[in-house]
């Protein structure tokens, strides 16, 4: 009996330490497991941070130019017919960050936009357009003369309103500058947009408002149609990358009457416009056109009707980093209608015909750094018709350098401009200009 007690005592003495060892081992296993899980979590966090950094770098490389919400200084128009103009600071379907010029009322967002721009211009040769560089106004009679001009007429003020109507974005946009007579406020844009319908005044459907060269000069090159007018536009997207738009727009052709004949120009039908655009991640290609009809009614005799029209091929491609190459080609009888020129003129027999015009624009925009950029563009145009229009050829060349500051809300720039005008009797006029500008965008 005593021996059994001794055996039991020995067993108990052995089991107690073994139990403690087992418990200690289990605790050690739990600690090791926790350490393994923590290490795995650290690895996941590291991988997630790497992904976030990579996304930030990608976004920075793919970003637009500084101040992109206020586009290339002299343009604005509905992006692809579905969004607000690039340079108008109009609210988009997603609410922009709050700023002193952005406020809301319920579900409606209001954005006051625009900028102040000072232009300092020096002409080394005579030219009729002192505020813009228009080769059509270059004299060919050998006139000499210099001119210095400082103005702020391009300064803009806009109001964009966005809100939901039946769970769809409804947009209103108003914009003006001071290019009216005697620096008066001038309406540029005033339109409403809901789903596929846009009504009001804005850039014509015929033009490519997303491919207007980024010149400091307000005029822009010759192949880019540049018209804002009253219109009704329908837009649809057949696929994710394609867009179709059709417009009925104000017609405003300029007609040169036959020699010695007095009368008036009648706008018998509107301009019918259309565009097709294909877009991918690096740029877009657009084909657009317009057709219309105008009439000259002499004070005595029968009226003459003339059909006018034109086509535009436009392309823009992001080449390296933020650099962009772009080109436009336009052609048509009566194309001058969209560049402030003559649409119809009489031939040698006095019969009224459309003036046939073709133009080309090619340019490259380069970013030297996040704050420094340059743009160079060349644009010739030819008047093909042998009509009463005395002009035969125009050239427009521009090269500039910009520096962005104030957190990309302002820039200073310097631009050189060269222009040529040549007439059918082989007379020529040349113009050289230096233009400096300072622009401050609204917050």
Question: Model-found features: residue ranges?
Answer:
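Detector for outer-membrane/organellar transmembrane beta-barrel domains
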Residues: 278-391, 395-396
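Outer-membrane beta-barrel "beta-signal"
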Residues: 405, 430-443
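Outer membrane beta-barrel
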Residues: 97-254, 266-269, 273-284, 316-317, ...
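N-terminal periplasmic/intermembrane-space "pro-region" immediately following the signal or transit peptide
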Residues: 22-126
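Bacterial N-terminal signal peptides
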Residues: 9-18
């Amino acid at each position: 009996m005593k021996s059994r007690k001794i055996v039991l005592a020995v067993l108990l003495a052995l089991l107690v330490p073994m139990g403690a060892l087992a418990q200690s081992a289990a605790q050690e296993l739990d600690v090791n497991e926790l350490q393994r899980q923590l290490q795995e979590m650290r690895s996941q966090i590291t991988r997630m941070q790497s992904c976030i950094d990579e996304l930030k770098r990608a976004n920075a490389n793919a970003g637009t130019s500084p101040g992109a919400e206020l586009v290339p200084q002299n343009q604005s128009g509905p992006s692809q017919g579905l969004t607000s103009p690039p340079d108008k600071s109009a609210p988009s379907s997603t609410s922009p960050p709050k700023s002193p010029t952005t406020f809301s009322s319920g579900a409606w967002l209001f954005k006051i936009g625009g900028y102040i721009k000072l232009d300092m211009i020096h002409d080394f040769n005579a030219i009729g357009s002192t505020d813009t560089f228009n080769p059509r106004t270059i004299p060919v009679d050998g006139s000499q003369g210099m001119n210095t001009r400082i103005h702020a007429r391009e300064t803009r003020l806009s109001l964009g309103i966005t809100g939901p109507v039946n769970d769809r974005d409804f947009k209103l946009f108003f914009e003006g500058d001071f290019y009216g007579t005697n620096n008066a406020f001038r309406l540029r844009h005033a339109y409403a947009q809901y789903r596929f319908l846009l009504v009001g005044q804005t850039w014509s459907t015929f033009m490519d408002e997303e491919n207007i060269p980024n010149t400091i000069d307000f005029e822009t090159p010759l192949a880019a149609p540049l018209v804002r007018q009253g219109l009704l536009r329908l837009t649809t997207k057949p696929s994710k990358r394609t867009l179709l738009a059709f417009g009925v727009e104000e017609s405003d052709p300029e007609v040169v009457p036959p020699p010695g004949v007095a009368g008036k120009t009648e706008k018998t039908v509107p301009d019918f416009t259309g565009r097709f655009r294909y877009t991918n991640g690096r740029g877009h290609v657009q084909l657009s056109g317009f057709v219309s009809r105008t009439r000259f009614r002499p004070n005595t005799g029968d009226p003459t009707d003339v059909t006018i029209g034109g086509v535009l091929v436009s392309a823009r491609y992001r080449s390296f980093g933020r650099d962009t190459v772009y080109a436009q080609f336009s052609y048509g009888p009566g194309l001058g209608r969209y560049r402030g020129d003559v649409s119809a003129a009489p031939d040698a027999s006095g019969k009224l015909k459309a003036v046939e015009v073709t133009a080309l624009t090619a340019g490259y925009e380069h970013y030297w750094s996040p704050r420094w950029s340059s743009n160079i563009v060349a644009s010739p145009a030819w008047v093909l018709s042998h009509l009463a229009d005395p002009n035969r050829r125009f050239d427009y060349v521009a090269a500039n350098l910009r520096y962005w500051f104030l957190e990309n809300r302002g820039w200073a720039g310097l631009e050189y401009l060269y222009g040529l005008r040549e007439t059918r009797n082989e007379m020529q006029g040349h113009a050289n200009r230096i233009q400096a500008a300072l622009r401050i965008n609204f917050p």
